[in-house]
Amino acid sequence: MQDSLSIDQARRVVLAAQQFHAAPASPKSASALAAIVRRLGVVQMDSVNVLVRSHYLPLFSRCGPYRRELLEEAAYEPKQRALFEYWGHEASLLPLESYPLFRWRMERARRGEGTWGRLKRFVTEHRETVAAVLEQIRERGPLGAGEIAGASRGPGGWWGWSESKEILEWLFWTGQVTTARRRNFERLYDLTERVLPSALLAQEVSKEHAQRELMKISARALGVATLRDLRDYFRLPTQDAAQRLKECVEEGELIPVTVEGWKQTAYRHRDATCPRAVSASALLSPFDSLIWERQRTERLFGFHFRLEIYTPAHKRQHGYYVLPFLHEGRLVGRLDLKSDRESGRLQVKGGSVEAGVKESTVIEPLREELSSLAK
């Protein structure tokens, strides 16, 4: 592949890397679903449930209808567990084998660096309470936050649900507990050593090696990307990301390229492919890794996308829960969707096509996607 890409070539490289190049094939096993997550490196989770929990949608977008129970098995069934929860991009499902690559982040949290400073101060002021919560999990886990609240007494008396939640977040960030399973999407926490394989927990890797591996995973999943794009995928520290990128280039894993219309230098993964065409049609979760980095989405697709869930209704441009529509290598429209669980119907609250796109060219593939999603 040449060291200069047209914007159309860049889109095809990216879509192939993000697993949109092959014809949808419904996974029949938990391991098959986990393999897709492994190729993406990470799938974001979110509590918003207007349509469906967000972590189910990226897999649907790439492989069509599948049994959601299979993803639950891959994430939480002890004998089939191939995924774990941690802060990858945001709250995420990650391939089990990547657990050691996040230990540096757990150590940063333990030291209270950066965004963890507030939690560190909180647990420092509540040491005995933290110890009591951890002991309860050891004795009775897995437990949800509500099952711990007020269950023991610290030096200041009974503590409440919000304090338990803060403590559990701290224990989760630092790797002392993890998600054993979910109950109506509520995390049930247990000691990490009781959930994940001991051989995995025994692996030690340096911060530099771990970040370098995360950079490579990002590059494989993105195909071609700028430093900003690569850093954002796993939210690496800015200075560390720049150094890891330099090392990956020196190793030959990443190749500097120019992309039509991009001001910044781009980097192509050495194994990236550029298919002749990408014919996929897919509705995308607002939390899909293809469109995480909003500036990247505009650079690649000329598509301005912002999440409007927290925007007052009268100020929204497109709707509350809007899914971009990918068709034949372009983002051609968007739909505001909602699941009416009482009637069992999929509601289309609104929609539009992008400027220059003929409605007649997208109506039929969009209808097919909606029909598939409604199942």
For each feature predicted by the language model, list its residue ranges.
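Long, charged, low-complexity, helical-prone intrinsically disordered regions
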Residues: 1-375
